[in-house]
Amino acid sequence: YGPRYSPDGSRVVYSRQGGGGLTGSLWSGSRGVFVMPAAGGESVEIAGNGADPQFSADGERVYFLTGGGLEKKLMSAGLHGEQPREVFNLKYVDHVAISPDGRSVAFTELFNGYVAPLPATGGSIELNKDTKALPVTALGTDMGSYLHWAADSESVHWMVGDRYHSRALAASKPDAGVPVGLRVDSDAPDDTFALVGGRVVTMRDADNSEEVIEDGVVIVRGKRIVAVGKRGDVAIPAGAREVDVAGKTVMPGIVDVHAHAAHFGQGVVPQNNWAYAANLAFGITTMHDPSATTEFVFSQSELVKAGKMVGPRVFSTGTILYGADGDFKAEVNSLDDARSHLRRMQANGAFSVKSYNQPRRDQRQQINQAARELGMLVVEEGGSTFQHNMTMVVDGVTGIEHNIPVAPLYRDVVELWRQTDVGNTPTLVVNYGGLNGEYYWYAKDNLWENERLNRFFPKNSLDENTIRRQAGPEWDYYHIEVAKAAKVLRDAGVPILVGGHGQMQGQAPHWEIWSLNQGGFTPFEALRAGTIDGARYLGLDKEIGSIEAGKRADLVVVDGNPLQDIRRSDDTALVMVNGRLFKADDLSEIGGKQRPAPEFFWQRGGGGVPTGVNYGPTVPCHCPKSDPHRH
């Protein structure tokens, strides 16, 4: 990772890191910082751990980062076996760039950039924007990523979204930025499909009717639905590929609005994501991740949009606007602070932000106001804090993620909430206040025997979360009580959405739908929560969420009838996203590019096992970024 040339171009320094949840652990045994000849040859270990290495101005030492979180250090080591020594204690600083002339250091701290002299001292110094040990100059606000120096050490560059920014040290402020201008065509299928003979659950005008078309026909041309109706009422175009779906149910693809999907990473971006495949195979065609590494998740999303990777539509808030402590916290003490954070996230591709446990109400209100000005959504972390939740409802956020930590809910809460447009994603699989819903569903099925999960899920991760299961008596599963409270809210007009929380990729959104049914939602109402209601929550209902002419062709074909037995919702036979049709059992493509079933690292000889990933009860869903220098 992070190879860099020495000043004279004769050597390259790089770090070796371990594997990850998307790449496996093969070749993870030898980690650290290494130097090798630029022309090729043997590598020499400089340090046993570290990341982001860079040469000193004379090429005789290497700087690198160690630690993680609030306990990071910038170290330096010679090229001939000298013991590494500390240069800076970093705490809130998350990126350091030494100038080519060795005289200055640029760094980012809590999403702002600074520059200071590089001292020639023998001891370690605390580096931060408020240090008294060095004169520190702010580079600008709305800072982004990839901070680096110009070759002459007279200016600093960085990226914010697709704009390349520069600040000359002699200038009073940064330039306006130059758009990089990289454009890639989005995937555009040109097939025409006719799905014939199935039961079509359209979710059209689903608040007022429960439209089901028996012996229906759905015509898809390219990436859009062009017609839907009964057989005989809809003409099948000449040349269309007819797909017999008699005896099956055709419904909109599932929209998971709270979908954590292995989106924490740095460095090389994997070009295959088994979490995407698992979700798509189970009929999830849209995912919204409300906590992810910004650069990583939007890179993955763009690979899907360009057709370079198979998966659902992927949207995200990027890194959360964290209100507690950490080197990624978002300090919000004014409306301008909030605007700065939201501008940065919007530039990177977010249309939503996650306001996460900002402790003061005025801070949360400032984020809300900035979002209104910028046309963005705000999804609030529920945080198991009832009093905060009620102020969130009053202040008018887009929605609250996770359940209200008390149930049942009484009339005062319901009457207050129904007068707003604030939604709720209860994430019953990880509900607050009692035994989680996921434990209930783990106990009901032998998931380690599920053929589809075994194809799309790393075997060791699947087994460790499904074989030895925690269980309790039926009355102890609190998610059912929470689901009943959600039903009361929905009957009062409060949008209730489906969020699988990444607990079991692909399967968890169905658990969420089934849990809503346990709370009193009819099968249609539970499916509505996972389709058109989710699309409306994300502001995407004009494009997805129902089967209507003109909308994007995101569909799932289910064996059986989930309107009669909601547990059939995960029995997917075919799935279509953006007009591309796949067999659900292996995700081989029908028509179009005719791509074969995807292959994953654990299916190859010596592919290793995933590391740094835990699905199920210990899912790490709010880590802001990976810590490649923590070992």
Regions found by a protein language model. Give the residues of each.
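A flexible loop/linker signature enriched in serine peptidases of the S9 family
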Residues: 1-2, 6-34, 38, 42-75, ...
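Conserved blade-ending motifs and adjacent loop-strand segments that build the rim/top face
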Residues: 88-93, 129-148
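Histidine-rich, glycine-flanked metal-binding segment
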Residues: 206-251
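Metal-associated gating/positioning segment near the N- to mid-region
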Residues: 249-306, 326-327, 336, 362, ...
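Divalent metal-dependent hydrolysis catalytic cores, especially in the metallo-beta-lactamase
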Residues: 275-295, 311-322, 346-358, 368, ...
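Active-site neighborhoods of metal-dependent hydrolases
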Residues: 341-359, 403-519, 524, 592-594, ...
